[in-house]
Amino acid sequence: MGVPEPLVEAADALEDLPARVGERDWGRMLPAARKDWYVDCNWKVYVDNYLEGYHIPFVHPSLHRELDYARYRTETRRLYSIQHAPLRAEASRLPAPAAASDDGAQFYWLFPNLMLNVYADNYSTNLIVPLGPERTLTVFEWYFADPEDEGVRRRVAETVEFSDEIQIEDIHVCEAVQRGLRSRAYGRGRYSVKRENGVHHFHGLLHGYMNEQ
């Protein structure tokens, strides 16, 4: 079985990712909050859920109200993908981007188990840690500029609260999917070309590494 390349050794495969994220003023961002979540599902189920946007209108009503879902799209590269998430004009819980043409949020996934969520005033990382065939730890960490400032502390609390809402909704779905995978009635379906190209990309990478001689 193949072993995924360490990130430093996969730098060439990351292509333009350093330049994309390097546009931000990361030097001012400091750790502001951390939270661990334990989920009763396989780690790959959790990654699948992160990468597909099909479920957003049905599972995440609060998030759906923030996003311009018609313009939501996923871009895949060699070892990573980006979900571009423009905001609605009336969005109130996610920070507005610096320019109207910018994405309100960008959700980066780096194969196999690291996520980077970039917003106008903060970013967060999700590290997905397999604990067993049906048990996963997800480590959330948030970074803000000047996290000791009183106003920023309020913003951190609001951000974590909104993230918790979404995470709880995702956990219900992931654990239900894991139960469904054990069912004798389970059968594979087709990928949604528009909403599940990120999932298809992940599965292709996983298949390649698992079958590498």
Residue ranges and their predicted role:
Residues 1-213:
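C-terminal catalytic domain of Rieske-type non-heme iron oxygenases
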